[in-house]
């Protein structure tokens, strides 16, 4: 078959395959056109789930007689005229495909009148060449579009339409989403002659909650947390639901970019990540969020139905949304790690070359000066086995099976860096820290591989935080919470030149009292040593950087607590402060599993080998298996 230009009707029907998926798609496109026309009232009439009739009437600016024929043509639009316009879209529509595509798979009638015209005009397209016929009609200022017999000429498409109830349910959901985007517009939805939804205009922000309650329900409004966050050209506002009520609100997920409703994976991932430590795998967050961004920084022309966008600075937007939602959720009463203050001791210290400069939460194992090739091979094999187990955990993590698996790998520079959870309180008896001898590890000392520097194989984990391990020919219980605290204490103990600060993507504003401001000024050098860059102006502090172990913490809460602690001491050593911080940081996991335990112990063995040689009280408890076996075998 030779190459030929397709007839207009066939070309439009091909385009309709992307634009017109079902009756709800038609409603979305036509209502968005009404919004672009400046309508303040939109009436929607549906018959038989949209299969028989879809009528959209608005009081917008209307379409002049001269433009009616063009309105039904492909690639004809009043929204853009140049590439520069396309790169800064604020209107809902811009491709000029909707009306032509809809008219190719239905009987579409467009009636419109502008304020300058004394009479209205009606247009419809028919035939193979989609010729447009125009005739006078009676109509107020505004437009009415009637879509009759959708898919009448494409039986295959009509066959795939669902029941009347299902199709109207999709239409209802589209109208709900649009109503949440435009509080200033009154919208009425009728089905088979019966009024189903009536959303009155709510131009006053104080009235927005009324529409929010009518769409999302009183339960959402009761548990909603208002959010308002801004950074440069980025602004996010709206409501997120208290995680405690998520089990009843899982279907309430509405997100908008420049008032355009979205189901974007990056946005969903950022929100889900903010909630991940507060919800189990079966729960979903509930939210109504509005993201305002410079239109030059977002490309909306990447999805046929415009449900997804592409941000020019995707990581910035992702972290902005994550930080904003996280800051609001932290206002809820989440459990806080409670560790006893008794027995503070300095953390194990070692040479700086054992530290990785930046970019990951891993620390390198010191080189062994006196190790044979065979010993090194054994050490590499043990390390490789543990790393494979840790990698298996990352690949099987329940959250990565949710939406955004690709984005989690794409947007997080380190798979090991996760937002801190809010663990349950740990008994003080399990985390006491008796004084133990601490020696600096040098290259001249005994190598750090071999059984002397390994806890042993993890057999199982007893919730919430105890691992059963092989130990010295027997078994022992190990407290993962205590091991994690010692690891963080070691990571936070600075070398002579101090911890390296890691700049925050978005500087954090923190309100301080007089004592906290004084502590910030008096201990400025100490904070710099700990990798914390904090400046104070007019009673407000700006946090610009923290050391790597602190990046995933609740800094809005941790920094004031840290300054409050410093205000009680005129002089304090970096190691003492590292001990205090380790006791007040959130745990990585509320309930541990075997893979997480293996990953933690691998890091402890590399970074704190002294804990393997001389376990502190509360870390390890050997179990007398021989006595238990003797009891079982006793006759």
From Swiss-Prot:
A single GO molecular function term of this UniProt record: ATP hydrolysis activity
Xref: PROSITE patterns: DNA_MISMATCH_REPAIR_1 (PS00058)
Disulfide bonds: none
Pfam families, sorted: DNA_mis_repair (PF01119), HATPase_c_3 (PF13589), MutL_C (PF08676)
InterPro entries per record: DNA_mismatch_repair_CS (IPR014762), DNA_mismatch_repair_MutL (IPR020667), DNA_mismatch_S5_2-like (IPR013507), HATPase_C_sf (IPR036890), MutL/Mlh/PMS (IPR002099), MutL/Mlh/Pms-like (IPR038973), MutL_C (IPR014790), MutL_C_dimsub (IPR042120)
Keyword Flavoprotein: no
Family statement: Belongs to the DNA mismatch repair MutL/HexB family.
Protein name: DNA mismatch repair protein MutL
Top-level taxonomy: Bacteria, Pseudomonadati, Pseudomonadota, Gammaproteobacteria, Enterobacterales
Gene that encodes it: mutL
């Amino acid at each position: 078959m030779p190459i030929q230009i397709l007839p207009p009707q066939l070309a439009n029907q091909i385009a309709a395959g992307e634009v017109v998926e079902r009756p709800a798609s038609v409603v979305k496109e036509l209502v968005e056109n009404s919004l672009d026309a400046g309508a303040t009232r939109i009436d929607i009439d549906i018959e038989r789930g949209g299969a028989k009739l879809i009528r959209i009437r608005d009081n917008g600016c209307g379409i002049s007689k001269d433009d009616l024929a063009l309105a039904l043509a492909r690639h004809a639009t009043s929204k853009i005229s140049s590439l520069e316009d396309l790169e800064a879209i604020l209107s809902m529509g811009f491709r000029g495909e909707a009306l032509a595509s809809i008219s190719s798979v239905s009987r579409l009638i467009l009636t419109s009148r502008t304020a300058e015209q004394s009479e209205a005009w009606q247009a419809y397209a028919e035939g193979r060449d989609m010729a447009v016929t125009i005739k006078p009609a009676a109509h107020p200022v505004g437009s009415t579009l009637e879509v009759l017999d959708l898919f009448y000429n494409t039986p295959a498409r009509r066959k795939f339409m669902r029941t009347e109830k299902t199709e109207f349910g999709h239409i209802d959901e589209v109208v709900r989403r649009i109503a949440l985007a435009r509080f200033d517009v009154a919208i009425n939805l009728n089905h088979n002659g019966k009024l189903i939804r009536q959303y009155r205009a709510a131009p006053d922000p104080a009235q927005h909650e009324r529409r929010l309650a009518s769409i999302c329900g009183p339960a959402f409004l009761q548990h909603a947390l208002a959010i308002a966050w801004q950074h440069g050209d980025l602004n996010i506002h709206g409501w997120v639901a208290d995680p405690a009520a998520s089990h009843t609100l899982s279907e309430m997920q509405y997100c908008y970019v420049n008032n355009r409703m979205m189901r974007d994976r990056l946005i969903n991932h950022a929100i889900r990540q903010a909630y991940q430590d507060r919800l189990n795998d079966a729960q979903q967050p509930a939210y109504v969020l509005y993201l305002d961004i410079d239109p030059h920084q977002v490309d909306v022309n990447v999805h046929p139905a415009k449900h997804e966008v592409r941000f020019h600075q995707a990581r910035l937007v992702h972290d902005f949304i994550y930080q904003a939602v996280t800051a609001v959720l932290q206002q809820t009463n989440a459990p806080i790690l409670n560790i006893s203050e008794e027995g503070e001791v300095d953390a194990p210290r070692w040479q700086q070359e054992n530290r990785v400069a930046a970019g990951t939460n891993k620390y390198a194992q010191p080189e062994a000066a006196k190790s044979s090739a065979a010993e090194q091979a054994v050490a590499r094999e043990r390390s490789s086995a543990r790393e494979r187990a840790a990698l298996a955990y990352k690949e099987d993590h329940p959250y990565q099976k949710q939406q955004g698996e690709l984005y989690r790998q794409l947007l997080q520079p380190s798979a090991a860096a996760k937002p801190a959870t809010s663990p349950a309180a740990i008994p003080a008896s399990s985390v006491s820290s008796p004084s133990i001898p601490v020696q600096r590890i040098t290259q001249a000392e005994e190598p750090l591989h071999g059984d002397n520097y390994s806890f042993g194989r993890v057999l199982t984990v007893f919730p919430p935080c105890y691992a059963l391990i092989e130990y010295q020919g027997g078994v022992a219980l190990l407290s993962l919470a205590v091991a994690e605290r010692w690891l963080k204490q070691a990571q936070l103990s600075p070398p002579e030149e101090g911890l390296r600060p890691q700049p925050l993507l978005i500087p954090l504003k923190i309100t301080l009292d007089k004592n906290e401001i004084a502590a910030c000024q008096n201990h400025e050098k100490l904070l710099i040593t700990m990798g914390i860059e904090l400046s104070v102006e007019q009673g407000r502090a700006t946090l610009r950087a923290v050391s790597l172990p602190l990046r995933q913490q609740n800094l809005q809460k941790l920094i004031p607590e840290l300054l409050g602690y410093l205000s009680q001491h005129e002089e304090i050593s970096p190691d003492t402060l590292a001990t205090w911080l380790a006791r007040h940081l959130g745990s990585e996991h509320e309930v541990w599993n075997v893979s997480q335990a293996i990953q933690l112990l691998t890091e402890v063995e590399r970074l704190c080998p002294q804990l393997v040689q001389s376990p502190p009280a509360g870390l390890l408890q050997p179990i007398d298996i021989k006595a238990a076996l003797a009891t079982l075998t006793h006759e």
